[in-house]
Swiss-Prot record:
One of its GO terms (molecular function) is ribonuclease T2 activity. This is Ribonuclease MC. The lineage of its organism: Eukaryota, Viridiplantae, Streptophyta, Embryophyta, Tracheophyta. The keyword Hydrolase applies. The gene is MC1. One of its GO terms (biological process) is RNA catabolic process. The keyword Transferase does not apply. It catalyses: a ribonucleotidyl-ribonucleotide-RNA + H2O = a 3'-end 3'-phospho-ribonucleotide-RNA + a 5'-end dephospho-ribonucleoside-RNA + H(+). The active site is at 34 (proton donor), 85, 89 (proton acceptor). Keywords: Disulfide bond, Endonuclease, Hydrolase, Lyase, Nuclease, Signal. It comes from Momordica charantia (Bitter gourd).
């Protein structure tokens, strides 16, 4: 792997695309961690064969922070989500970050990359109104020094686009922010 995508999700938007059933994250009003995804040559590396199995005991010291910062917003089972993310993504960076280090890295990234805190001074926080991709990217670059990636989903009925994820891109060391080069949002979206 040569870099990371640190992906935070906006639970109200994520939940709005769920077709049925309850969504435990619908009431959350802060960005939560979706995952820390190793990248290689511009592609997400997944399901790496040499990885070790998820072991909750290796991250028990982080569990209270993970419950807050990395909840399963779709189903009330956080450990299942962490296991999925470790197996699908984390194992691909295990040569550098073992399981405990991987989850600690994600917690540290979330604590240092506070999206709402960066947008609030610009009155650009979540209010269900139209936002400009250029403005949001600019506010986040002004705060953190590098451009994020913005990921949107479009409602198939209304054709309205909603911000669902913000990606912070990091070098292989997991601490050096780099510019993200990919967005899935158009010029404007609801947030």
């Amino acid at each position: 792997f040569d870099s990371f995508w640190f992906v935070q999700q906006w639970p109200p938007a994520v939940c709005s695309f769920q077709k049925s059933g309850s969504c435990p994250g619908s009431g959350l009003r802060t960005f939560t961690i979706h995952g820390l995804w190793p990248q290689g040559s511009g592609t997400s590396l997944t399901n790496c064969p040499q990885g070790s199995p998820f072991d909750i005991t290796k991250i028990s010291h982080l569990q209270s922070q993970l419950n807050t910062l990395w909840p399963n917003v779709l189903r009330a089972n956080n450990q299942q989500f962490w296991s999925h993310e470790w197996t699908k993504h984390g194992t691909c960076s295990e040569s550098t970050f073992n399981q405990a280090a991987y989850f600690k890295l994600a917690v540290d990234m979330r604590n240092n990359y506070d999206i709402i805190g960066a947008l609030r001074p610009h009155a650009a926080g979540p209010n269900g109104r139209t936002k400009s991709r250029q403005a949001i990217k600019g506010f986040l670059k002004a705060k953190f020094g590098k451009f994020p990636g913005l990921r949107c989903r479009t409602d198939p009925q209304t054709k309205v686009s909603y911000l669902v994820q913000v990606v912070a891109c990091f070098a292989q060391d997991g601490s050096t922010l780099i510019d993200c080069t990919r967005d899935t949002c158009g010029a404007n979206f609801i947030f």
